[in-house]
Amino acid sequence: MKEKIISEINLDLVFQCNDFSQFSNKLKDSKTKLIFESIFWEKVFLSWINTILKKEDYELPYYIFEKKSFSLGLQIISNQEIASLNKKWMQKNGPTDVLSFPIISDESLNNLDQIELGDIFISLEMALEQSYEYKHSIYREMIWLASHGFLHLLGWEHNNEHDLENMLNFQEYLITRLN
């Protein structure tokens, strides 16, 4: 892949995390505690944006390459809250691990200095269950879910096995590029 030189990227991250003190016994180590810090997620998303912007051969919406200022929201919520969102917006019963709500459209870009990508919601309870099921850390699972939600904000979909495989491979690529 060809690398491009890019200028400074700005990110406005709106981060919110519920009180999950009931899980404090499962979230003890210092690396895991990072998932509750806004500055951590800002660095993660900036890393991913920079990784994407340095390559010319990704099939992403053109506007991603035209702007250098982005905004997105990330909320870490409960199963109950994500189940409510899942029912209201996806017409699906029960909790899910991650939901993304992209809001960017070509029409909304004309006079904007900053691209509003949308919002990502992650269920901490589902992430804990899945980290146990897949035998990796909650830190790894949260990064995985955030990368999945982030790619949906950029227009990625997985309506078939081929698209899903490409998306999952790209998620892994982004995760391996984190410093």
Swiss-Prot record:
Its cofactor is Zn(2+). This is Endoribonuclease YbeY. PANTHER family: ENDORIBONUCLEASE YBEY, CHLOROPLASTIC. Zn(2+) binds at residues 148, 152, 158. It holds the Pfam family YbeY. The gene is ybeY. The lineage of its organism: Bacteria, Bacillati, Cyanobacteriota, Cyanophyceae, Synechococcales. Belongs to the endoribonuclease YbeY family. It is found in: Cytoplasm. Gene3D superfamilies: Metalloproteases ('zincins'), catalytic domain. Its EC number is 3.1.-.-. The keyword Membrane does not apply. InterPro entries: MetalPrtase_cat_dom_sf_prd, YbeY, YbeY_CS. GO terms for cellular component: cytoplasm.
